[in-house]
């Protein structure tokens, strides 16, 4: 699919989502991966918009959490924000919107189209594009429809100190320690992004991404706890018990 066709698809997408744009250039940039920008003249990647969008979502989510959740501490508010303004959470929203289908990316990088971090970046970039093109009022309409309902369903108890919660659960079945395998991602993604794999006895229970090792580890622990709540929980219990017998 060529750029012209993608832009036509973008215009239709914006119309369907009640975003009456003033300047399409913001949205084109928001959906342009740097591998595509590197191969084409006079087009910029979404990197700077992703930076702006991240800052906007941090602020907007903080205000919403303060208004929506009663009697919470600063630490609890930070946990709720970290749970929702993270790669996995924003990636889910991006995929629901279908942003990756509109992504301009080099042919050699097509395998990255469904990448979690890239989809999260797309959501942040798209938020920045709406803000820069149409202002705060229109962005609020968009966030009320797409983003705030996602935050409002957060169960605070389920996200309190996910690393300790997972460790306590594992220790109830096994004496083996858990570890976090940290990888710094570079090249096609971006430097200063960390991937954390939560591992126990050679098995990966959760994977997280973050701009710091701490954030990546917390997200990995959160994903691991979600795995334990899934239908496969009994299978995991049996596997851990089997380890104890060995």
From Swiss-Prot:
Q: Which cofactors must be present for this protein to function?
A: Mg(2+)
**Which EC number(s) does UniProt give?**
3.1.26.3
Q: Can you state which reaction this protein catalyses? A: Endonucleolytic cleavage to 5'-phosphomonoester
Q: Which UniProt keywords apply?
A: Cytoplasm, Endonuclease, Hydrolase, Magnesium, Metal-binding, mRNA processing, Nuclease, RNA-binding, rRNA processing, rRNA-binding, tRNA processing
Checking SUPFAM superfamilies in the record gives: dsRNA-binding domain-like, RNase III domain-like
Q: Active-site positions, per UniProt?
A: 54, 124
Q: Pfam family of this protein, just one?
A: dsrm
Report the residue ranges that make up the RNase III domain in this protein: 10-135
Q: Hey, what's the signal peptide range on this chain?
A: none
A molecular function annotated in GO for this UniProt entry is: double-stranded RNA binding
GO BP, sorted A to Z: mRNA processing; regulation of gene expression; rRNA processing; tRNA processing
| SMART domains recorded | DSRM, RIBOc
- Keyword Acetylation present in the record's keywords: the answer is no
Give the main location: cytoplasm
* Residue numbers binding Mg(2+): 50, 121, 124
Q: Which domain of life is it from?
A: Bacteria
Xref: InterPro entries: dsRBD_dom, RNase_III, RNase_III_dom, RNase_III_sf
Which enzyme class, named as a word? hydrolase
Q: List where in the cell it is found.
A: Cytoplasm
Which HAMAP family did the record assign?
RNase_III
Family the entry assigns:
Belongs to the ribonuclease III family.
Q: Subunit composition?
A: Homodimer.
What the protein does?
Digests double-stranded RNA. Involved in the processing of primary rRNA transcript to yield the immediate precursors to the large and small rRNAs (23S and 16S). Processes some mRNAs, and tRNAs when they are encoded in the rRNA operon. Processes pre-crRNA and tracrRNA of type II CRISPR loci if present in the organism.
**Protein name from the UniProt record:** Ribonuclease 3
User: What is the scientific name of the source organism?
Assistant: Mycoplasma mobile (strain ATCC 43663 / 163K / NCTC 11711) (Mesomycoplasma mobile)
- The gene for this chain is rnc
